[in-house]
């Protein structure tokens, strides 16, 4: 299943260590509350800039379904993630957004591949995100990881800022690929 996404806000440049904590959330806003959810998300992200260990937070909405939002978070480690969860600004976001969400799904991820070039807040202002969810055949994840790493490493350039591959921690055969492009035209040029 493909979801074409655009960037709402970005936090900071980051590097991924072995202990990095990555989370993905799917948030479905109730009717007429998309703007409020965007505002709450932006406030939470901007308030998170000064948190040590918070590396990046991407807040995106689906082009095909504007009330569907994704939050992709990168933390130095589990301790940094827990510190973010206990912050006043996150508690405010969680409390206020709970009243306007039709659903919320948390997906715990394991990093499999991460390649980036020119991934800075300035470059990401008009960036285009593409998320792909895959279900692999049983016991094929190691082979797929090798293939996807080679492909992603070659794909990162001036038009493709980043390529990430994750597997779900509770279902290793379910993968999430996140691609960040300069703009939608760059994404379309890579598809052909």
Task: Spell out what each predicted region is.
Residues 17-69, 74-86, 91, 98-192:
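Short S/T/G/P-rich N-terminal loop/turn motif that feeds into the first structured element of a domain
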Residues 4-14:
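Sec-dependent N-terminal signal peptides
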């Amino acid at each position: 299943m493909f979801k074409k996404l655009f960037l709402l806000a970005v936090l900071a440049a980051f590097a991924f260590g072995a202990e990095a904590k990555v989370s993905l959330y799917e948030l479905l806003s109730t009717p007429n509350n998309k703007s409020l959810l965007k505002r709450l998300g932006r406030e939470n992200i901007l308030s998170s800039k000064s948190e040590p260990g918070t590396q990046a937070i991407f807040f995106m909405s689906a082009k095909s379904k504007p009330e569907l939002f994704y939050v992709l978070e990168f933390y130095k480690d589990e301790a940094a993630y827990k510190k973010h969860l206990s912050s006043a600004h996150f508690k405010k976001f969680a409390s206020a957004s709970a009243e306007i969400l039709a659903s919320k799904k948390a997906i715990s991820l394991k990093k499999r591949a991460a390649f980036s070039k020119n991934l800075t807040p300035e470059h990401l202002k008009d960036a285009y995100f593409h998320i792909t969810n895959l279900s692999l055949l049983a016991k094929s994840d190691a082979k797929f990881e090798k293939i996807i790493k080679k492909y992603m490493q070659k794909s990162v350039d001036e038009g493709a800022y980043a390529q990430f591959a994750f597997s779900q921690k509770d279902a290793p055969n379910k993968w999430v690929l996140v691609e960040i492009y300069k703009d939608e035209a760059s994404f379309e040029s890579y598809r052909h």
